[in-house]
């Protein structure tokens, strides 16, 4: 697996770090972190918990957009560069004096504090490293910092760390926090159950290994929870680059290095919402579900799902990278084990004895009744006054 071309790009000398150029800097947020409703765009640069750091133009260009808002990016500048990219500087406390005066005049003219302006080309032109504003804590910021982005000509967000800024040091590989295997259809099983299973992990340095052989059958999906750290910072940042190999063959890759704002809400199908809702952590699905239109995946024709066959052994290696090329790995073995199916005796249920859940095209029924198991019983469903008879695909006695 060779790192993407963007990683440690060779054009690092054409862009300057916007805070304290040529000095050590620290980040509180990185590209692609999983937030509740979106992926984090760009990077968040620490300013020592203070307002007032000079913000420098990352490359020569001119201001194309100015926004003043009490939410979101707060006071923000957008600068177009000769290569067609746009840099974004958000949560500013002040703009450069000439911009500040222009904004104030327009606010008075329009009798509004919140304003969005589009200056003429070269009306506010700056050279590389010239000060364009002062860092702040405006808008939806939760603490003083500079939010910084680089966007391409289509306004897609690029990962700024792919520009090789030497001001940020990172020799720490990603850290694994959790791993799970999920059955993906009604015929699939993990440890003979139609349930998502958390896998126990052992760690040696940054090499991780599953403590148990995973017994599974049918189509299953892998899910990973972890974070990345950078030198000198306690923040838990996101893991953007993940690769899955099965018996030496690449099944899945993700590299969150380019992001379209129009697809941000698809994060809700990138992470397993049921786990986030009940347990809190946001795992990466290492497979692509129906309806997911995000563009940063490479998968097999199974969309990253594994088809586990009875008695076959699958050696799996999962590689996690950060933009600086640091790597950690997880190794596990999945062995195919056909399910031991048994069905519930058909009985009449009292309303207070049953519950049910529907996920996709699967109906799960829960009952507190204790009854004998028989192989050929059926289930009668009353749907809108019509009785439909079906045979359950799976039965689990949780009292056994």
What is each model feature region?
Residues 9-86, 95-98, 112-122, 127-128, ...:
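Surface-exposed, glycine-biased beta-strand/turn segments
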